[in-house]
From Swiss-Prot:
InterPro entries: PSII_PsbH, PSII_PsbH_sf
Subcellular compartments: Plastid, Chloroplast thylakoid membrane
Membrane-crossing residue ranges in chain numbering: 41-61
Official protein name in the record: Photosystem II reaction center protein H
Length: 79
């Protein structure tokens, strides 16, 4: 490890790597908060779409009352 002692205090110097150089810009905005709502609305839309997707999958799995008129069987998919 690259540790150097100066005046009874140790200082560690990190090693530069190509992965670190690539990831450095992602960490440069740490602690900063954009003003306003930012992408909160977009995130809400995606959460709502995901909830609809989960409800559809659950209804197909349970053959729910909402799907009474729709045949849900693998044999109906055959030509």
């Amino acid at each position: 490890m690259a540790t150097r002692t100066i005046n009874n205090t140790s200082q560690t110097k990190g090693r530069r790597t190509s992965v670190g150089d690539v990831l450095k810009p992602l960490n440069s905005e740490y602690g900063k908060v954009a003003p306003g709502w930012g992408t909160t609305v977009l995130m809400g839309v995606f959460i709502a779409l995901f909830a609809v997707f989960l409800v559809i999958i659950l209804e197909l799995y349970n053959a729910s009352v909402l799907l009474d008129g729709i045949p849900v069987s693998w044999s109906s998919l055959e030509s």
